[in-house]
Structure formats: C-alpha cells, structure tokens
Swiss-Prot record:
Region entry Hydrophobic, spans: 1-26
Binding site for [4Fe-4S] cluster 2: 117, 120, 123, 157
Function: Part of a membrane-bound complex that couples electron transfer with translocation of ions across the membrane. Required to maintain the reduced state of SoxR.
Name of this chain's protein: Ion-translocating oxidoreductase complex subunit B
Chain sites annotated for binding [4Fe-4S] cluster 1: 49, 52, 57, 74
E.C. number(s) listed in UniProt: 7.-.-.-
Gene that encodes it: rsxB
Length: 192
C-alpha cells in the first residue's frame, strides 16, 4: 500500500513541477501579437471562406497589416468591412476588388431541401458561422440572417440537398446609391 502512495505522490510532484516550468516558460517566452492585426481580425466577418485568396480571416488580417495587402478583398464583409478597415488604418477607402464586387451584389444564402436531409450534421460541422441548426438524424435548416453564402456547406452534404440561392432584395437589403440624388442644404433661420 505504501508503494501506491509513493507512486501517486511522485507523479503528483512531477506534474506540479512540469506545470510550473510550463507556466514560467509561457510567460517568459511569450510572443506579443500585433495589435493592428487583432483589430483588423475583429472587424472581418470570421466566415473563413477564403474568397479573399487567404485561407481565413486571420491570415488576411496579417497580410493587410504586415504586407500591405489591399483592404477591399473581403466579399462577405463587402463595403462596410472595407470602410471600417480604412478608418482603422487611416487610409483612403478603395472600391471593392473586381472579384469581390462580382460576388457582393447578389447576396447568396444556403437553402436546405429538408425533405432530402438525412440529418448527418456534416453541413453543421462545415459551417464557420454556425448558421445551420439541427440535430443528428433530424432535418436541418439554415438561419438566413447568419448565413454568409461562403459555399462551405454544399460539398460535404452526401445527399446534395443544399444549394445556394440569391436573397430577394428588399428596401432593407437594397444598396441605395445616395450620391445620384443631389441634396442641397437649406439654412433655417430660427425666430424667437
């Protein structure tokens, strides 16, 4: 019985010693991240879709900050994200990249044919923004307001019941061009 307690104590002391060494090493040799990269990464939509030419949002943020990559390549984020990054970096806003511009006018969302869905959860695992809900062996559905249209859920589906469809434009989703209507400011005099 004494041998068991000695072994337990020895393993516990070794675990404590190695934990202390790892804790010290993590603080001593810590590498600080670039705060600009962190801020750009927070602005990006985190869809990890790869439409910008990078494998995810973090590598694209690093390329913008460190390599001077264009700020207009995020198709899911569109113009709103580009304007926020331009404001953060204090640079001139750029028109959307040609590839991104082609993708942004017709916003696409995933639609699941629920009659053919077998509930395998492969689409849920593939979705980077958790826009698909459902349980194992039950039909799944897409929350269209969260879907970025990244197309990552289509290929894993074994029954091919997922397709991307354009979102119908409404007054809320329409991109209004406010520069086409000239607006003149009329001074108002207040009389007391």
């Amino acid at each position: 019985m004494n041998a068991i307690w000695i072994a337990v104590a020895a393993v516990s002391l070794l675990g404590l010693a190695f934990g202390a060494i790892l804790g010290y090493a993590s603080r001593r040799f810590a590498v600080e991240d670039d705060p600009v990269v962190e801020k750009i990464d927070e602005i990006l939509p985190q869809s990890q879709c790869g439409q910008c030419g990078y494998p995810g949002c973090r590598p694209y943020a690093e390329a913008i900050s460190c390599n001077g990559e264009k700020i207009n390549r995020c198709a899911p984020g569109g113009e709103a994200v580009m304007l926020k990054i331009a404001e953060l970096l204090n640079v001139e806003p750029q028109p959307l990249d040609g590839e991104a511009q082609e993708l942004t006018p017709a916003r696409m969302v995933a639609v699941i044919d629920e009659n053919n869905c077998i509930g395998c959860t492969k689409c849920i695992q593939a979705c980077p923004v958790d826009a698909i809900v459902g349980a194992t062996r039950a039909m799944h559905t897409v929350m269209s307001d969260l879907c970025t249209g990244c197309n990552l859920c289509v290929d894993p589906c074994p029954t091919h019941c997922i397709s991307l469809q354009p979102v119908a434009e409404t007054p809320d989703s329409w991109k209004w061009d406010l520069n086409t209507i000239p607006v003149r400011i009329i001074p108002v005099e207040h009389h007391a």
